[in-house]
Amino acid sequence: MRNIKQLMSLKGRVALITGGAGHLGFAMAEALAQAGAGIILVDMDQAKVQARVVDLKKKYKLKAVSMSMDITDKNEIKSLPQQVFQKMGRLDILINCAALVGTSYLKGWAVPFLEQDLETWRQAMEVNLTSVFALAQQCFPLLKKSKNGSIINIASIYGVLGPDMSLYEGTKLGNPAAYAASKGGLIQLTNWLATNLAPEVRVNAISIGGVFRNHQEPFLSRYKKKTPLNRMATEEDILGAALYLASDFSQYVTGHNLIVDGGFSAW
């Protein structure tokens, strides 16, 4: 039987993280890097993702590369596996973190229902759901060769729960229908992929609660009151779940939606 350090180790493995220049994507990259993984950061913001890779290399003395790409472009996604193989030689972990979220600035997004825009709905589905299917499809051959393949989809409690819109009254925040629908679809896609890519590749989701981004009152107090642990999440709160699902700690876990929300959904 392996010891705890061996089960947690990602030494020799390679992880690709979409949305890698963002707060959560980069935090997960750092966690996996500390466990020994090589890192591929994918993001549309070329300058920012390149700077993130420089930071990773400086801190952890590991192999890390950046890729600037539009994950809704089918041609760019098709070219991804070849680029990954050329740059890193393998792929063991795929984390789908890129997403349009409730605080994204889009036309007809975080607005009342009758004002929500159909084109923005379609864009959210492309980014939050369709891209995950396409990336899994293209990366599966490399993940299958790994023998330790793991896909982690970053979902949301709002893929499971209906929103309490009273949280947002009197604020500029909102909870778009497209966000909830795309994240609910992502959880079901996780189940579908888990049964179809097994036994070679495990597929799981992490449904996170609200992550603190300098939220102001009255939203902050309202959210804390609805959360048994009486606070919003930080990036650090998600890292244990990500490392667990990426490593052999979860070698017998697939098709699971791990909720990390401070108890928000426990009421």
Mark where each language-model region is:
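C-terminal substrate-recognition "lid" of short-chain dehydrogenase/reductases
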Residues: 198, 231-266
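Catalytic Tyr-X3-Lys loop
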Residues: 92, 100, 114-133, 148, ...
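Short, small/polar-rich loop/turn modules that mediate ligand/substrate recognition or access, typified
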Residues: 95, 148, 198-202, 253-255
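Amphipathic alpha-helical dimer-interface segment in Rossmann-like NAD(P)H-dependent oxidoreductases
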Residues: 82-85, 99, 123-145, 158-159, ...
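Conserved mid-core segment of classical short-chain dehydrogenase/reductases
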Residues: 78, 100-122, 164-171, 215-218
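Catalytic loop of short-chain dehydrogenase/reductase
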Residues: 114-120, 144, 152-198, 210-211
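Canonical Rossmann dinucleotide-binding motif of NAD(H)/NADP(H)-dependent dehydrogenases/reductases
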Residues: 7-40, 193
